[in-house]
Amino acid sequence: MGQKVNPIGLRIGIIRDWESRWYAEKDYADLVHEDLKIREYINKRLQDAAVSRVEIERAANRVNVTIHTAKPGMVIGKGGSEVEALRKALTQLTGKREHINIVEIKKPDLDAKLVAENIARQLENRVSFRRAQKQAIQRAMRPGRKGVKTMVVRRLGGAEIARSEHYSEGTVPLHTLRADIDYATAEADTTYGKIGVKVWIYRGEVLPTKKKAEEGGK
């Protein structure tokens, strides 16, 4: 089971939270499509800003968007000009008040989305798929890191028959629900067609917090 399903979806409600946090009844479908448009617009506009994920929260007619990025300076711009232009564009897109928060990713080598996109960009620049994967694993597996696994799929090296090839180091316990595993995919557009990239990064176990029961008379 753990080998097949999305590791993030499997852990939602256990050690992971939803990336869209709001409640709606009749207009639920419209808001889901609106979230999709917001994410697509941000990822397209900030495709060079190393954006990992976008979290969306809603309250009344206000939308709070949190952008996790490894290059906050590029997102904010000089004097906040870029983030203000982005806020106005999103307000025009949705017709609602938009508030944008920027969160810096301090360890991009531990972010599966950024690692997958880095491998994809190297493949587009004609770097060997073996070399791209091995370099990504070496950067991720520094002292104290638990494990990482990468996989590339399709016509590797221009071969006639599609295949997959993966590399791993350390442990990636997909069946352990308390294991904090980050997972992401990316696509590389090459002269031989698209190549799919998958990355799993194990960042250690997340143990539930123990609530201390208050005992009377102590």
Curated annotation (Swiss-Prot):
GO terms for molecular function: mRNA binding; rRNA binding; structural constituent of ribosome. Keywords: Ribonucleoprotein, Ribosomal protein, RNA-binding, rRNA-binding. One of its GO terms (cellular component) is cytosolic small ribosomal subunit. InterPro entries: KH_dom, KH_dom-like_a/b, KH_dom_type_2, KH_sf_prok-type, Ribosomal_S3_C_sf, Ribosomal_uS3_bac-typ, Ribosomal_uS3_C, Ribosomal_uS3_CS. One of its GO terms (biological process) is translation. Binds the lower part of the 30S subunit head. Binds mRNA in the 70S ribosome, positioning it for translation. Part of the 30S ribosomal subunit. Forms a tight complex with proteins S10 and S14. NCBIfam families: rpsC_bact. Belongs to the universal ribosomal protein uS3 family. HAMAP family: Ribosomal_uS3_B. This is Small ribosomal subunit protein uS3. It comes from Geobacillus stearothermophilus (Bacillus stearothermophilus).
